Amino acid sequence: MRIMSLDVGSRTIGIACSDALLMTAQGIETIRRTSLEKDFNRLQELIAEYEVHELVVGMPKNMNGTKGERAKKTEEFVAKMKEVIDLPVTYWDERLSTVMAERQLIAADVSRKKRKSVIDKMAAVVILQGYLDRLQFNK
């Protein structure tokens, strides 16, 4: 059983999945959003393929910890998703996850064009790895 993370944006959803031991996060793909039905269908396919038992969704908070418009849209997405996907969902603070992902990609000398295509997936990796590290710390 694995944990999957989602970095939900207005145009894309970055997806990452844990290993079976719940130690490391790997980027899976970036879904280009077209409709909720197609988004949820693809998520269901990935959940089945990776045998996922829990979802972690990045919560885009403001730097002062408050929830803004993007956070409300994420909560709306999750509420609709729960109507078709019956898995526990944990929100995880995603402040600076995209910045950290961008820095990792720059350090790895990934081209600007390639960074743009993988940044959402990498942000999902940062979100999930933070969650997995917390699970290990609390053991």
Question: Model regions: which residues?
Answer:
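Conserved catalytic-loop position in the HRD/HxD motif
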Residues: 7
